[in-house]
Amino acid sequence: MPYEPPTHTVERSLRATTGAKVIAGVDEVGRGAWAGPVTVCAAITGLRRPPEGLTDSKLLTVKRRTVLAEELRKWVTSYALGHASPEEIDALGMTAALRLAAVRALEALPVRPDAVILDGKHDYLGSPWKVRTVIKGDQSCVAVAAASVIAKVQRDKMMAELGIEHADFGFAANAGYPSPVHKAALAERGPTPYHRLSWAYLDALPQWRHLKKVRSWADGSVPEIEGQLGFDF
């Protein structure tokens, strides 16, 4: 299929139908990884023409994605990132962890959005946020596509830094997702402090299965994420 750049169609529709003036596009990365955080970016772009070649981060080469992310960070009106740690994913489950990361991103923006465009069909944000879900929004919607690229590049950088400490796991190449190198290191060495211990991959590793658990916080609170992965977000 020929390349079709994302547009401001959804943003314009929200402005016309809801009166929203400040609209944030939101996308996540790391949902299916075995290690590392889930990362969410919220980006406010307005209706300006985006940098050339903007699309879903998964459709871009690493080199192009990295260059484009730098362009986008300068081009967007504002953006912010939120993360949910492996511990929080284990304690809360993925849907709640996504919401936690998304709220952190949205609340870190300099202005509260009037509406949010969320990639996908499932609204994991909910009330009080005014949400419009868009399937493949990271390909069709400018603000969501921008959030997709920024989130992907930032999380990849974080995982590459973790890979320095745990070189055998190949985090710089696989970003915490399953790969032959990652699986071999898990079988030999077991999970790192950055692995999600409630996930099914441990069922296939009998020597490490005893580590599988879903953690819960005794007081019902969720700890702050800063510092939990070894560097400042």
Swiss-Prot record:
Keywords: Cytoplasm, Endonuclease, Hydrolase, Manganese, Metal-binding, Nuclease
Main localization of the protein described in the UniProt heading: cytoplasm
Residue ranges of every copy of the RNase H type-2 domain listed in the record: 21-211
CDD domains: RNase_HII_bacteria_HII_like
Positions in coiled-coil regions: none
Compartments in which it is found: Cytoplasm
EC number of the protein: 3.1.26.4
Top-level taxon in the UniProt lineage: Bacteria
Cofactor note: Manganese or magnesium. Binds 1 divalent metal ion per monomer in the absence of substrate. May bind a second metal ion after substrate binding.
Catalysed reaction, written as an equation: Endonucleolytic cleavage to 5'-phosphomonoester
UniProt GO cellular component terms: cytoplasm; ribonuclease H2 complex
Family matches, as SUPFAM superfamilies: Ribonuclease H-like (SSF53098)
Cofactor(s) this protein requires: Mn(2+); Mg(2+)
Binding site for a divalent metal cation: D27, E28, D119
Enzyme class, UniProt record, top EC level: hydrolase
MF-aspect GO terms: manganese ion binding; RNA binding; RNA-DNA hybrid ribonuclease activity
GO BP: DNA replication, removal of RNA primer; mismatch repair
The family this protein is said to belong to: Belongs to the RNase HII family.
Its biological purpose: Endonuclease that specifically degrades the RNA of RNA-DNA hybrids.
HAMAP family referenced in this protein's UniProt entry, alphabetically: RNase_HII_B (MF_00052_B)
Protein's UniProt name: Ribonuclease HII
